């Protein structure tokens, strides 16, 4: 019984449709495709013998051509889905590879640092234990003892007493004065006199140099206020050279852009907090001090009326508002940023946000 029903249904599909059936079938498609396409199909399919399957294929083909659909679109969609899946997998693999490589590099650096510390310890230990440095010291001590024994202390001592005292008075060093006060002229030994005389004999030379330098300082006196002003001017010049916007242009388009920028800033923070925002941009080296002064002069006679009567200005701006200000600054400086660069920047930001979210989920 089921086989008979299938045969009857297949025979109906293979039978040719009459013109009235074709018109009824096409009229039912008016809510799916435009009416002019239905009229074109009626005119082109007159006096043709077509089955229901053939008519369905013709209608589907015409609708696909009209709506811009091609049989290749499905394949392209599948390919794009596969490519997206592969790109996600590659991103995950790259993240794993970067983490593993970073850990390997950190381990290698730690090993190299440990090896360097061991080498430093191995190099320093023989230097401390080397007996060669002690030999010249012993020789010097022996020579000093021989020279001291050969000197007649009775004849030499009064001379050193008379020569020591005036030389010590010339030196303006508190450390030397304290050392000299501790020496008693009556109870000193011959060893002490000889060693101190050798030291003090070389001291008057720097005192003479000090006297010369003090004389030059007395002759040439530069006022400190002048030096500070010069230093301030040089620092301000360096800051202005490194700013993004050194000076505001004066053409008509630039002045219109300046008014728009000030209107944007006042709409965010109001006129009272405008000075703080401009000072913030000055500290970031976005604009120069000259530009800040000119912007404040322009904003003196500006008023902003908000649609909301209960609106209150905030003391700070959002990061998006600062980005808009940076775009205004680059435009006024003659370096406008194209839309392609902005779109690339937005894509990079979205990628970074996705990576951050994926890392948090790991």
From Swiss-Prot:
GO terms for biological process: archaeal or bacterial-type flagellum-dependent cell motility. It comes from the Archaea. The keyword RNA-binding does not apply. InterPro entries: Arch_fla_DE (IPR006752), FlaD_prd_arc (IPR016682), Flagella_assembly_related (IPR052494). Keywords: Archaeal flagellum. This is Putative flagella-related protein D. To M.jannaschii FlaD, also to FlaE. Its main location: other. GO terms for cellular component: archaeal-type flagellum. The gene is flaD. Pfam families: Arch_fla_DE. It comes from Methanococcus voltae. It is found in: Archaeal flagellum.
């Amino acid at each position: 019984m089921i086989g008979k029903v299938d045969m009857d249904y297949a025979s109906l599909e293979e039978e040719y449709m009459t013109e009235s059936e074709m018109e009824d079938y096409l009229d039912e498609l008016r809510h799916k495709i435009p009416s002019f396409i239905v009229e074109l199909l009626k005119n082109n399919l007159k006096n043709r013998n077509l089955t229901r399957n053939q008519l369905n294929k013709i209608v589907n083909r015409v609708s696909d051509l009209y709506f811009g659909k091609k049989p290749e679109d499905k394949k392209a969609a599948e390919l794009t889905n596969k490519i997206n899946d592969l790109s996600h997998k590659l991103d995950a693999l790259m993240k794993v590879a970067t983490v593993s490589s970073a850990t390997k590099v950190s381990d290698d650096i730690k090993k190299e640092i440990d090896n360097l510390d061991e080498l430093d310890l191995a190099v320093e230990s023989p230097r401390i234990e080397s007996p060669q440095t002690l030999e010249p010291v012993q020789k010097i001590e022996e020579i000093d003892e021989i020279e001291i024994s050969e000197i007649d202390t009775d004849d030499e001592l009064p001379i050193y007493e008379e020569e020591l005292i005036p030389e010590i008075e010339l030196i303006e060093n508190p450390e030397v004065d304290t050392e000299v006060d501790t020496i008693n002229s009556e109870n000193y030994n011959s060893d002490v006199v000889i060693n101190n005389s050798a030291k003090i004999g070389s001291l008057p030379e720097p005192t003479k140099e000090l006297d010369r330098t003090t004389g030059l300082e007395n002759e040439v006196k530069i006022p400190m206020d002048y030096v500070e002003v010069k230093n301030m001017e040089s620092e301000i010049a360096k800051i202005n050279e490194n700013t993004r916007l050194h000076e505001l242009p004066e053409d008509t388009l630039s002045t219109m852009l300046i008014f728009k920028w000030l209107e944007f800033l006042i709409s965010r923070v109001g006129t009272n907090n405008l000075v703080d925002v401009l000072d913030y941009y000055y500290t970031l080296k976005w604009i120069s001090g000259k530009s800040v002064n000119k912007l404040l002069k322009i904003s003196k006679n500006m008023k902003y009326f908000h649609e909301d009567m209960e609106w209150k200005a905030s003391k700070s701006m959002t990061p998006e508002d600062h980005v808009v200000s940076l775009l205004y600054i680059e435009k006024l400086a003659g370096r406008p940023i194209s839309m392609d660069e902005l779109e690339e920047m937005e894509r990079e930001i979205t990628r970074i946000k996705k990576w951050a979210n994926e890392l948090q989920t790991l």
